């Protein structure tokens, strides 16, 4: 492979990654993110301060995720589009992933 081919591949990957990020001007809806969290995430994560505990202790509470140094809602949203193997494939849209990430981020203030 030539260097120019490799650079084109890297460039295409970067363009794709940027395209998957939430778009500016389309404000994420944390209240919709809350609904998504209760539907998809509450079985494994504590998704609200009022929730006593999930069915497993393997997944961190959303508030803990939100309070981590360097928390970045855009990175969380991108991760949610292709989660790790232990998480179910929720087939979220970019907007839904951004909403869920906004909701998680809102828990840092609680």
Where are these regions (language model features)?
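Alpha-helix initiation/capping motif
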Residues: 26-29, 51, 69, 90
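Periplasmic/extracellular electron-transfer cofactor-ligation site
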Residues: 28-58, 83-85, 106-110
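Residue-level detector of functional hotspots within protein domains
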Residues: 11-13, 27, 46-48, 71-78
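Extracytoplasmic electron-transfer domains, predominantly the class I c-type cytochrome c fold
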Residues: 57-106
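Post-cleavage N-terminal segment of exported redox proteins
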Residues: 1-27, 93, 102-110
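Generic structural signal for beta-strand residues in well-ordered domains
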Residues: 7-9, 20, 34, 55, ...
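Generic signature of intrinsically disordered, low-complexity, basic-rich segments
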Residues: 13-15, 23-24, 33, 39, ...
């Amino acid at each position: 492979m030539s260097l120019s081919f490799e650079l084109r591949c890297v460039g295409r990957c970067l363009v794709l990654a940027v395209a998957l990020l939430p778009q500016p001007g389309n404000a994420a809806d944390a209240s919709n993110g809350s609904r998504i969290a209760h539907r998809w995430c509450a079985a494994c994560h504590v998704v609200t301060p009022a929730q006593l505990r999930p069915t497993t202790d393997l997944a961190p509470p959303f508030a803990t995720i939100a309070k981590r140094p360097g928390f970045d809602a855009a990175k969380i949203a991108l991760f949610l589009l292709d989660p790790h193997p232990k998480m179910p494939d929720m087939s979220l849209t970019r907007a839904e992933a951004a909403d869920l990430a906004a909701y998680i981020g809102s828990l840092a203030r609680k």
